Amino acid sequence: MVVEEQSLENGGSVHVVKGESNFRNVVCGPVRWLKMLSSELHWSFVFGVVSLYGINQGLGGSLGRVATEYYMKDVQKVQPSESQALTAITKIPWIIKPLWGILTDVLPIFGFHRRPYFILAGVLGVVSLLFISLHSNLHLYLALFWMTISSAAMAIADVTIDACTAYNSIKHPSLASDMQSLCSLSSSIGALLGFFMSGILVHLVGSKGVFGLLTFPFALVSVVGIVFSEPHVPGFSYKQVNQKFTDAGKAMWRTMKCSDVWRPSLYMYISLTLGLNIHEGLFYWFTDSKDGPLFAQETVGFILSIGSIGSILAATLYQLVLKDHPFRGLCLWTQLLFALSGMLDLILVFRLNLKFGLPDYLFIVVDEIVSQMIGRLKWMPLLVLTSKLCPHGIEGTFFALLMSIDNAGLMTSSWLGGIMLHVLKVTRTEFGNLWLAVLVRNVMRLLPLCFLFLVPKGDQNTFKLPDEIMGEDSDEEKDEKEGTRNLELASLVHSVDRR
């Protein structure tokens, strides 16, 4: 510890302990950062991001992921390719996110644009998960139906917080990267806790029991809808709904025709689609193959929780070092690293790690940390870019549209990965061609580099759409619309309304 003596004006001196000062900065730095965001963006926005992303999606999502994998494998007893294809279906509600966005923007219920949808999302989530957890011998497709309903509940809650981030990114462009860092850190910390508990909980209460526990994060969503402050919209004419839907559709189509919008959107879809998802094949090999590690449930959860540290490191690295770099350069290097990181899975499948004296447990922990860190670094600049592509007036709906394109890419990736596992005959008991699936996936991850010309070269803090696309209003229109915007976006600022 270093101690320095500094002179005071009155001739005295004070001892400054640098070690303690640095430690205080490390501890107080994040607190000051959160206070700054709360001051600039309103405390309820920060609270909403932490609640929905940290608890509902981070903690609840990670628990649900592990529970779903074991539920499909041990309860429904499906093949890995079938499991991957079926679970991808549950993501369909995320593809139609623009519908939820339009509903919350233009269709108030009992005079409120946001509160009823939060309450509805929470109720749907609680009911669907209770049905899965309490029903014995539930048919596969009925279970899939209720999983899709719970996914829809999470998507409805998510779309409101989405719009808030998009709106604030436009009003505070210098804080766009900070907002994405907050979202990522909340999600990563929640996932860290969720994955850490997931294996233990699956072992203690089973996958169906975990579904029952997941009702609590959804109950929190309903509580958020009950307690947050939102201005009441008096005398709303429901005859306007059809016209507002039409206007929103025209505005989205007009914006999508702009090359500054459709080009990066196309790149995001291609990048996600070509990164073939073969997770279920690897998961079955980790847990069931005699030639594999044969990990227990607790071990799987612990490995995934440690892997979440990679996401936290990525969010921290992005916030401190990478948030000011150009979009195209970041996409180039993260995509290259993403392809190279997949080779770790190939080393594991060939069991080369054992030849170098590295046990499976240690190697997979390193693999998971590296994979999640690079995956998060690859994703964050795309999120920032997405938030900056949203025009005024339809921030929530258009952000939902762009994110639905990304979710469509993820679903396509899962389906293509499932098809590849099926073609290569990777089953519950046969894993002879799993190495080939991993190799093909790694090569496919390089192909998006051919489409980097679609990504803008601009800096993350200064990039913006042309004014004619952003839809700036005249002075009279601003005065006329200010009240309406305050009503429709107050929940974005005064509660937990959009990401």
UniProtKB/Swiss-Prot annotation:
UniProt cross-references to Gene3D superfamilies, sorted A to Z: MFS general substrate transporter like domains (1.20.1250.20)
Keyword annotations from UniProtKB, A to Z: Membrane, Transmembrane, Transmembrane helix, Transport
Transmembrane portions of the chain: 43-63, 92-112, 116-136, 141-161, 185-205, 209-229, 266-286, 302-322, 330-350, 354-374, 399-419, 435-455
GO CC term, one of those recorded: membrane
Topological relation to the membrane, as annotated: Multi-pass membrane protein
Main location: membrane
Pfam family, any one: BT1
Subcellular location: Membrane
Function: Could mediate folate transport.
Family according to the record: Belongs to the major facilitator superfamily. Folate-biopterin transporter (TC 2.A.71) family.
Protein name as catalogued: Probable folate-biopterin transporter 2
